[in-house]
């Protein structure tokens, strides 16, 4: 048997992000179906999103405590098993249990556990691989979440057209095969240490570092800027253009994800010629312009173009911030990646919720809510411009005793 190499580890991590895209994006395509098939209110169905992100937040928080003790390989295998089992439970539990909604909640919690672990594990596994062009590889890695999202929406839509949406449980089982197969792959690929034993920073050390909190703000802004448009892109397309739900999904979140993927692949090929700070500043500028088009353009197609521009711009925000933090705090270890994932997920929850609440406050005007979303890229740009991160300096090395730099 040929000895597996870092490239195989990277391939397994690519599939890991595709798995996360499946567990995050598949169920929302079926919300209307769940409503009609099981007679569950849309409010209750919408709570599955809260369960999904809530469990992921909890996993992000706890992972910094147990991943280093258990090891990356068993945790990565477990993450994919949770994801696959959760998708199978989604297919069968609502039919088996007397209260279908309970089945949806249990399935969501199980696959969200897998998704949360994947989010914490995959980036540090790739960061530890012996690649020279770390930030380019990180950007390419995160593009696979975007391509996974495009694939889930497009292929699921095609399946529903050809086989009928009533057969969605079959598709859930098909999607479950991907994490199960990748769990086997992770049993064999090489896993490299992120930092030497005993040199990884403790959570308390990170919390005492001013630089760490700047990275937290950047991650919250990155998650909020991305999801504030992504989660509402379908509704924006449907309302603005008067198209069907299927077309709205393809023109909204599918186009948004494709633009994110394009940005991440492009940066993976050209990013070594830019400083991360410069690239992130360009991204925030494009994001601000895209939000302005979405919120203030009187022409619906220009608003949709604004959604696409936001997708293109936010593409490098999440992986770029992770790379910036990893380079600045090389002893951060698993705790750094787990807490950054937690901050990003907080942004993913807070941004869309704020947009929805403000839209409701202004008689359902989605543009008003999206206009509020401008706050996040503006804040991110301000942190990049005016914080100490703008200066070229040595990495932030943490003193384990007091957290000082």
Which stretches of residues belong to each language-model region?
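Extracytoplasmic
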Residues: 8-40, 123, 229-234, 351
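Central cavity-lining transmembrane alpha-helices of secondary-active solute carriers
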Residues: 50-65, 254-266
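Intracellular juxtamembrane helix-capping segments at the cytosolic ends
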Residues: 117-130, 316-329
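Interfacial helix-cap and linker-helix signal at transmembrane-aqueous boundaries
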Residues: 34-35, 66-67, 158-164, 237-238, ...
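Helix-loop-helix hairpin linking two adjacent transmembrane segments in secondary transporters
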Residues: 133, 140-191
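Extracytoplasmic gate region of multi-pass secondary transporters
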Residues: 27-28, 209-261
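C-terminal ends and interior cores of transmembrane alpha-helices
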Residues: 81-98, 286-298
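Primarily marks hydrophobic transmembrane alpha-helices of the MFS/SLC 12-helix fold
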Residues: 73-76, 280
């Amino acid at each position: 048997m040929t000895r597996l190499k870092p490239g195989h580890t990277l391939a397994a991590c690519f599939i890991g992000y595709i798995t996360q895209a499946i567990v995050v994006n598949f169920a929302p395509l079926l919300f209307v179906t769940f409503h009609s098939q099981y007679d569950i209110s849309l409010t209750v169905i919408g709570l599955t999103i809260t369960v999904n992100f809530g469990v992921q937040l909890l996993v992000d928080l706890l992972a910094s405590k147990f991943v280093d003790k258990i090891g990356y390989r068993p945790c990565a295998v477990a993450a994919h098993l949770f994801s696959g089992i959760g998708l199978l439970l989604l297919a069968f539990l609502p039919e088996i249990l007397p209260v279908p909604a309970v089945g949806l909640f249990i399935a969501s919690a199980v696959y969200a556990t897998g998704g949360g672990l994947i989010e914490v594990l995959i980036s540090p596994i790739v960061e530890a691989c012996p690649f020279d062009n770390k930030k380019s590889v990180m950007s390419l890695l995160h593009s696979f979440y975007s391509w996974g999202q495009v694939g889930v929406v497009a292929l699921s839509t095609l399946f529903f057209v050809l086989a009928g949406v009533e057969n969605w449980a079959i598709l859930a089982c098909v999607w479950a095969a991907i994490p199960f197969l990748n769990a086997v792959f992770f049993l064999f690929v090489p896993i490299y240490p992120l930092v030497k034993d005993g040199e990884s920073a403790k959570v308390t050390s990170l919390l005492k570092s001013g630089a760490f909190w700047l990275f937290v703000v950047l991650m919250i802004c990155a998650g909020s800027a991305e999801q504030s448009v992504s989660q509402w892109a379908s509704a924006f397309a449907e309302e603005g253009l008067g198209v069907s739900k299927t077309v709205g999904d393809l023109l909204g979140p599918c186009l948004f994800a494709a633009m994110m993927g394009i940005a991440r692949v492009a940066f993976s090929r050209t990013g070594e010629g830019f400083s991360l700070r410069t690239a992130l500043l360009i991204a925030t500028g494009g994001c601000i312009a895209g939000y302005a088009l979405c919120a203030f353009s009187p022409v619906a197609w220009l608003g949709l173009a604004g959604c696409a521009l936001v997708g293109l711009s936010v593409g490098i925000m999440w992986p770029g911030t992770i790379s910036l933090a990893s380079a600045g705090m090389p002893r951060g270890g698993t705790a750094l990646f787990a807490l950054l994932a937690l901050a990003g997920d907080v942004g993913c929850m807070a941004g869309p919720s704020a947009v929805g609440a403000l839209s409701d406050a202004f008689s359902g005007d989605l543009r008003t809510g999206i206009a509020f979303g401008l706050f996040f890229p503006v804040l991110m740009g301000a942190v990049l411009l005016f914080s100490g991160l703008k200066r070229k300096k040595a990495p932030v090395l943490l003193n384990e005793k007091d957290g000082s730099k």
